[in-house]
Amino acid sequence: NGAGKTTFFNVLSGFVRPAAGSVRAFGVDLLSMAHFRRARWGLRRTFQTEQAIEELSVFDNVAMVHEHSRQGGSRRGDVLDAIAFAGLDADPEASVRTLGAGQRRLVEVARAVVGRPRVVLLDEPAAGLPDEETSHLAEVIRRIPEHTGALAILVDHDMSLVSACCTTTAVLDFGKLIASGPTAAVLRDDAVIRAYLGVA
């Protein structure tokens, strides 16, 4: 905690403006866009706390985000595809309030991948989930780039989840980048081990 992970996401998604520097993705300056334009451009985000609306159905929760889709297409088809991709076995018309914690997290992922996003930001998506549900979620996250063509960025302090999902890893320690590169190499880095375990 305190490494700067959520602040990094807040800058990318437009909730925090940095004092200096730039943020570019796919050749586009994200800082020049209002946060709602970033959504239209194709930036999606999950949060540490659920954002799904309990009173609405699974379908309607995902469909709300489809309004920011960067491509045309069948709204219903796109929404059902996102729900299926996330591996949600709930009835799309079921109220979100009837779902367990793991299924709710999958609703968040479906909201993040609907409408062919360019960048998907996942903020501690497995927090509080048991191992079995975390394993399923990790498999879904791993498939996001292939399924959507999007760049998926995961922030988490669960190194087993990072290892399972990420080919490239960057490590922040109190706001400073201390290592980046292939995940396996980064997780063996002495500076990373010291920062996370206090030993080298």
Regions found by a protein language model. Give the residues of each.
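Glycine-rich phosphate-binding loops of nucleotide-dependent enzymes
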Residues: N1-A200
